[in-house]
Amino acid sequence: FDENKAYKALLEAKEEGKIKYIGITSHSLETIEKSIEDEKFSTIQFPYNIIEDQADEVFKKANKKDIGIIVMKPLAGGAIDDAKLAIKYILSKDYIDVVIPGMESIEQVRENVSVLQDTNITKDDELKIQEIRNIMGKRFCRRCEYCLPCPLKINIPQNFLLEGYYARYNLKDWAKERYKSLEVKASACVEC
């Protein structure tokens, strides 16, 4: 991060009293781990939810270093329907400071805030969480790139990402346009 002009500008703004904290957001666990080791950031923001919980140990490490933890994608980009359970799951972790779910209505705000009344996970919640993991676990792309390299050079995570924009976010035209620009389409898959 030393050579990064943006980081230097943020340091300068902090020294001038224009900002209080510098945080980092990433979808790469490796980047988050490095930022914790470097101790240059006051907060980290990373996707975390019932089916994407690979950051647990990294979050605990950050918490021990007094680095704030902000969770994004608590509903896995809309893949998890039960918002209350998803937020409750995250808030039950004492090493997580903030969860930022997307909301489109006052009713969703009320529903999300109501979770704060009780963040303890019950046996029934645990069963629901396991059910979500069983259903989503095998078909949810975590962008880990374990599926790469594809012998046919299909960018598998990118295809899943576009499918999500098409199906969950209803950005059909946007997703189709980007899909057309892919060098190798998912339709070329031979299921090897």
Task: List each model region and its residues.
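Glycine/proline-rich, positively charged
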Residues: 1-70, 75-78
